Amino acid sequence: MEQPPPADQPQQPPPPTLTNPRFTLELEFVSSLANPYYLSHLAVTYPNLLGINKSGDDSDVNNDSTDPDAQGFAAYLAYLYSYWKTPEYAQFLTHPGATLRALRLLQEETFRRDIIRPDVIERLAGTDIAAEPVDPAAESGDQEGEQAKAS
């Protein structure tokens, strides 16, 4: 039986293979972070993980250094970002631009606190379409024409 690494030693990312359950679980989670409305759901449902006080009082915002749940989740997000941004792993992302942008933004304590605000989510949702790289080979002729008109 495999022993887990000591708590002070960072965990190694799972091998990038779709037959590895941990890899597919983390792929599904980071892929869901590309959806701003999922980020909003996390902020509303699990505010303690993001360092948000449920009362909504900005003066009482939890500090990551004092909340072990927020501290652990921030460390987990940093761990995920450290390897999903590499080409070896990013190739598996359906929406790499939006996913990696969300992971990068989630590294910031202020962003983790601010995503509970609807205006932040709406701005993030508005940038998703423009930020996604377009793969011309995957587009049909009609969609390309519509994109040209929008430009």
UniProtKB/Swiss-Prot annotation:
Q: Which residues form a coiled coil?
A: none
* Compartment list: Nucleus
Which region ranges are annotated with the description Disordered?
A: 1-20, 131-151
Q: Which InterPro entries match?
A: Med31_sf (IPR038089), Mediator_Med31 (IPR008831)
- Which Gene Ontology biological process is one annotated for this entry? regulation of DNA-templated transcription
What domain of life?
A: Eukaryota
Annotated Pro residues bias: 1-18
* Protein family membership: Belongs to the Mediator complex subunit 31 family.
Q: How does it assemble?
A: Component of the Mediator complex.
Query: What this chain does, per the record?
Result: Component of the Mediator complex, a coactivator involved in the regulated transcription of nearly all RNA polymerase II-dependent genes. Mediator functions as a bridge to convey information from gene-specific regulatory proteins to the basal RNA polymerase II transcription machinery. Mediator is recruited to promoters by direct interactions with regulatory proteins and serves as a scaffold for the assembly of a functional preinitiation complex with RNA polymerase II and the general transcription factors.
The name under which this protein is listed is Mediator of RNA polymerase II transcription subunit 31
Q: Give the species.
A: Aspergillus niger (strain ATCC MYA-4892 / CBS 513.88 / FGSC A1513)
